[in-house]
Amino acid sequence: MAQLSSQGNNAIIYLSYAFMLATGLFLAWKFSSNKDFLSSNGTQRGIPLALNFVASAMGVGIITTYAQIANIAGLHGLLVYTICGAIPIVGFAVVGPVIRRKCPDGFILTEWVRHRFGMVTALYLSAFTCLTMFLFMVGELSAIRSAIETLTGLNALGAVIVECVVTTIYTFFGGFRVSFITDNFQGVCVLLLLIICAAGMGSYIEIDTSKIGPSGLLKANKLGWQLVYILFVAIVTNDCFMSGFWLRTFASKTDKDLWIGTSIAAFVTFAICTLIGTTGFLAVWSGDLIVGDENGYDAFFILLSKMPRWLVAFVLIFCIVLSTCTFDSLQSAMVSTISNDVFRNKLHINYVRIMLILIMVPIVVLAVKVADNILQIYLIADLVSAAIIPSVFLGLADTWFWYLRGFDVMAGGLGALLGVFIFGTVYYHSAREGGKLLLIWNGLYDSSDWGPFGAFVIAPVGGVIITLASAALRIAVLYAYSKVTGKEFTALDKPVTVEVENQDHTYGSIDDDESDTKKVV
């Protein structure tokens, strides 16, 4: 690697963090208020939303995860990953207005769940939501640590701690409003990084065209087809756990702005992740790696080693900016979720800020001590979301599933995770391996191992089946109880909901006809 001196690297790292701190504090002083600390509903137009969704969908981890899949499953696997990562962003424009019709004063998914299924179910979903964001924060710190150490050869512990301190300080004062603005900055940085790195790689990397055909990286493959299902289910459901996406969905001024923002973001995310991922097979064609190389996740940095030092320094700066903005978004989203779901936004803003500081301690410890496999961290969160989210979303269709209650949803989600364990135990003939499957211990990229595929089938399908079975059993028990006691049977009564309209939106069910919805001013 064409590295700078340790003094030069340290200067770049800590001056970059100082710049981000100064920028964040200035934005907090200029734009923040207690009103916007947790959310900014109905304030944002399409283009700022697009930049925010792009930034929320990315972190430094994209540099390694997409290159790794490209090195293993070639163009087929890479396109599957990037398409599956982009399409769910548009899903917020589809589902977001429906959620807002039902819960116009909320700003995250769990608030609608509280209205539909009750407090206990909302806390259940909130716990898994916070767990997901916790894992993503650990993954992001692990990713920036790996990036800094690879680019500089330095121990990145100090940089990781400084990043946490920097984002905590300006998020402490600015909250969601500052996070939203820094995400716009991050979106621009990602585009600049892409343009400069693409130009650099085009100038300094030599491709041996004789290796392209024999590598087989441009052909369809079994793993690529397996990932079509696995990654789509994993990413669609996991995005629903990311409160940062919901905060931005509710921040849209109109549904049209939401459609514009998510559509642009989906396309840009697809393009950026695809181009970054191509380093996985470019490194093979340049002779630096082999197909399925154990260092495939480092393909971007391996190619970067062929470039001049100024370009390495540039990439280091933008990795820091990218990670800092991603991390502050996760911080803001987690604090907003806890404040809303646990304390009902009644906690004094200073206590919310203290909570922001406290959650950093375990995250830093885990990121430094135990988080080595970034992709596996994400996959654990993906499997949990695949088990829980489908049964929750049945509650959007009141015409068909009005009889579902919170108990059914919780039984479905937890039962699905138990089902994955049972499947793994049977498939691998070992309870130990069944437990490992819950953690996706063996990864996704072994096409001969159908365990992960089965897990991502059992999780959503099993969750829905168990939810419906739980509802049927509960209704049957209540019916028998009403017959025995003579009490009124109400288990199949449709819940009465108040339809509310906010701004130019109509709020109701996913299957409501607009002509039947009453406008309330």
From Swiss-Prot:
Primary location group: membrane
**Membrane-spanning segments:** 11-31, 47-67, 79-99, 117-137, 156-176, 187-207, 227-247, 264-284, 310-330, 354-374, 377-397, 406-426, 453-473
Matching InterPro entries? Na/Glc_symporter_sf (IPR038377), Na/solute_symporter (IPR001734), Sodium:Solute_Symporter (IPR050277)
Q: What happens when the gene is disrupted?
A: Decreases spermidine uptake. Does not affect significantly salivary gland-secreted histatin 5 (Hst 5) mediated killing.
Q: Which residues are glycosylated?
A: 41
- List, alphabetically, the Gene3D superfamilies matched: Sodium/glucose cotransporter
Q: Name one GO cellular component term.
A: plasma membrane
Function of this protein? Spermidine transporter that is also used by salivary gland-secreted histatin 5 (Hst 5) to enter into candidal cells. A major component of host nonimmune defense systems is salivary histatins, a family of small (3-4 kDa), histidine-rich, cationic proteins secreted by major salivary glands in humans and higher primates. Hst 5 is the most potent of the 12 histatin family members and has fungicidal activity against blastoconidial and filamentous forms of Candida albicans. DUR31 only functions under high concentrations of Hst 5. Hst 5 cojugates to spermidine to be uptaken by DUR31.
Membership in a protein family: Belongs to the sodium:solute symporter (SSF) (TC 2.A.21) family.
Q: Which PANTHER family match?
A: AGR155CP, SODIUM/PROLINE SYMPORTER-RELATED
Please identify the protein, giving its name as recorded.
Answer: Spermidine transporter DUR31
Please give the organism. Candida albicans (strain SC5314 / ATCC MYA-2876) (Yeast)
